[in-house]
Amino acid sequence: MKKLARLTALLLTGALLLALTACGAAPLAPEQQAKQWLLGEINSYRATLEFAPLEEVKQLSDAEQIWVEQFRAAGKTELPESTTNETHQKWASMTGNWTRCDTFGLGVKKDASGELIDILLAKVPANTPEGKAELSEALNHHAFNLSACTRIGIAVVTIDGQMYWTCSVYS
């Protein structure tokens, strides 16, 4: 009887593991889905140029995430540079050993008083034909058109219901 109970328990455990495996991993959060979609689209574009795909490097994506988290915390897409200096220093310390080719999605402008303002520029387009056309236009940016650059740090953030993204490309 004990052997039958043990066998039944083993079979049930195996069936449970099989069911969990069949279900797959937990679904990705929308920002993570967008990030994976963007990276796939970038690499599809680079394949048409016969360039190597961009490999995401966790340390570099963590550095990009530092930027977007500051915008998320403020709930804004524009922040005075005086409030982002510490973030920039942290980003620089995380990326300092890498050769940066270019950055996309993060810009700077001057306000009326002459103060520099950091801005999140790139909205994540919808995964529709129109959105893909919009992204295709964005992929003409210098950052994605350098064959020697093969590493990327990328981050996505949602602010007021709109997703934005930024990335830096490295050799």
Predicted regions mapped to residue ranges:
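Enrichment for repetitive, rod-forming helical segments
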Residues: L10-T13, P53
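C-terminal motif of bacterial Sec signal peptides marking the signal peptidase cleavage site
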Residues: A19-A22
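Short, well-ordered surface patches within globular domains
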Residues: A26, P30-N97, I152
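Generic surface-pattern signal
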Residues: T13, A47, E69, A73-K76, ...
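Intrinsically disordered, low-complexity Ser/Thr/Pro-rich tracts
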Residues: M1, G24-A25
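Bacterial N-terminal signal peptides that target proteins for export
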Residues: M1-L11
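A well-ordered secondary-structure block
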Residues: N85-S171
